[in-house]
Amino acid sequence: YLIAVPSFLLKLIEYAKQHDIDLKTSGVKGAICIGEPLRNQDFSLNTLAEKITSQWNIKLFSTYASTEMNTAFNECEKQQGGHHHPELIIAEILDENDQAVPANHVGELTITTLGVEGMPLLRFKTGDMVQAHTEACGCGRNTMRLGPVVGRKKQMIKYKGTTLYPPAMDNILNDFSEVECYIIEISNNNIGTDEICIKIATKTPSDKLLSRIKDHFRAKLRVSPKIEIHDKKVIQKLQFPIMSRKPVMVIDNRKTDS
């Protein structure tokens, strides 16, 4: 088994193709994936995960973790969310008023690390917007499970009356095989509202492709952001700054109140 960022698995697949390496003989049975979501909110594989499994017959497992919590929410073999370890941390899903959200609602994951050593935290706000699942899992465990991260609280975008998180845009862009790579830039316009500019790289640039992508955005999210075509090297330089352990997919240039 590998522990990897999903987008790096795609790079491994690309490398194998370029060097005539048969992945069937690799001996890899699966990957425990970190840093990027694998699933939609209904736990089906998202487009990124489908791209991996369609080219490499391995099983993918999601995990959610952070340095601060000193533990992880890992998927079991049923792959229906990451299991909570109540003996290690107390997990709460809170609204903007620090109150527990109703069942089946999204809120900010807040943790208290009473069961781990070295770094105790009381009601630490992770900044990640998630939904809890409390029904019994098919594996037999009864612990709460975390669904896929909806987005970062600070990356919430109010765009033309619609609330968006970058992962929703990731899923749409990953639907297009023509898009080699991309980066999402968020900024403020001259009246102080949010603007989105998505920079993509493609080997087949055309107005028709841009129109298809925009139509897909309107169908899925009811809005269509600005989309620009750039050289692949320009986008990759933005995606992989020096010392970064995983690709940067969002650049948030919005001004924040001090």
Predicted feature locations:
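Active-site glycine/GP-rich loop and adjacent strand/helix microenvironment
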Residues: 1-258
